[in-house]
């Protein structure tokens, strides 16, 4: 076997591919970007002004289009998300379902005054409405900023204040180790006095009455009256897709901004190389979407490739240490991406 045909465990990334990348990385990424669907081609691949890079100048693209619209003709009925809650409840969301819900919530955001460039903070547990909100933002050119649902009101407030988000999307509760977490109460505390926050959209999950304030609206009520038709915005390649904040362990959290075209190109290619994804695969990444691994390997990466992914709300050892392995067995997971800590349990 020649070295040029030898696979190193990274899918299609063979020696020849690596040599091409090393010899002229700008030309290499120029070719990789062509694997995505662009509304308008770019005129310049890279403008580098250290430490800032601008990729695919002049090109126009949309992340929601590349994860949803491109699949509707061929795999609309294929499961996109297989969701399981900690209590064992489950949902199956096809690519057609996801497309419809994303379009509807994109129109909800428009009705709340959100336009291209506005920021939307998402403080949701690991439920399908989280990627739906992310993709709805991407569809209309809003910039999503997801905050891990385990963060305190003070940590959440820092991030909302820095991003100046006009709309917050949250839930009344999340579930962890059999207990409910009052997410809405944390939101109310975090936005007290932040007058630039105009609306809070609340996904109601728990039984009983939910006390709503003047800025609050219920997810299901807004969705019921929303159109399922929403054309994707044609966005410049450098248009921000999302802001994700660092953990803040070494100082004030820093918002890291990811541009659309560069992020999608890199992720689309590296996801294929790392996982060698096939149409029949069931992909399961245990990362929380509140972190960049979750953005890339629970949301954008699998959906770019038309994969079926597992999404789990809960901890890996509840009600016992076999939980993750039970999920793998039940859904026939073929690719499993997790941490060494989880494997050592």
Give, region by region, the residue ranges found by the protein language model:
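AMP-dependent adenylate-forming
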Residues: 46, 67-94, 204-211
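Adenylate-forming
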Residues: 125, 167-186, 207, 312-317, ...
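Structured binding elements
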Residues: 141
């Amino acid at each position: 076997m020649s070295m040029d045909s030898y696979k190193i465990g990274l899918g299609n990334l063979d020696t020849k591919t690596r040599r091409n990348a090393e010899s002229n990385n700008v030309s290499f990424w120029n070719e990789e970007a062509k694997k995505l669907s662009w509304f308008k081609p770019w005129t310049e691949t890279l403008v580098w002004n250290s430490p800032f890079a601008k990729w695919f100048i002049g090109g126009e693209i949309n992340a929601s289009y590349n994860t949803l619209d491109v699949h509707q003709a061929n795999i609309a009925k294929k499961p996109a998300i297989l969701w399981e809650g900690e209590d064992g409840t489950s949902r199956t969301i096809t690519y057609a379902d996801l497309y419809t819900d994303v379009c509807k919530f994109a129109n909800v955001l428009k009705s709340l005054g959100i336009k291209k460039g506005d920021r939307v903070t998402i403080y949701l547990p690991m439920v399908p409405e989280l990627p739906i909100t992310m993709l709805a933002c991407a569809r209309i050119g809003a910039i999503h900023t997801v905050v891990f649902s385990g963060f305190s009101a003070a940590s959440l407030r820092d991030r909302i204040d820095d991003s100046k988000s006009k709309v917050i999307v949250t839930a009344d509760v999340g579930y962890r180790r059999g207990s409910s977490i009052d997410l809405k109460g944390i939101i109310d505390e975090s936005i007290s006095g932040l007058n630039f926050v105009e609306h809070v959209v609340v996904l109601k999950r728990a039984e009983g009455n939910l006390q709503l304030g003047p800025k609050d609206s219920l997810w299901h009520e807004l969705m019921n009256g929303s159109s399922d038709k929403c054309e994707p915005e044609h966005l410049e390649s450098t248009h921000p897709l999302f802001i994700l904040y660092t953990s803040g362990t070494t100082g004030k959290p820093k918002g890291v901004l990811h541009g659309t075209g560069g992020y999608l190109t890199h992720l689309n290619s590296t996801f294929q190389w790392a996982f060698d994804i096939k149409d029949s695969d069931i992909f399961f990444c245990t990362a929380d979407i509140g972190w960049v691994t979750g953005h890339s390997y629970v949301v954008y990466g699998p959906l770019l490739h038309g994969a079926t992914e597992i999404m789990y709300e809960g901890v890996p050892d509840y009600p016992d240490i076999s939980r993750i392995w039970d999920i793998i067995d039940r859904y026939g997971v073929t690719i499993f991406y997790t941490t060494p800590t989880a494997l050592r349990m």
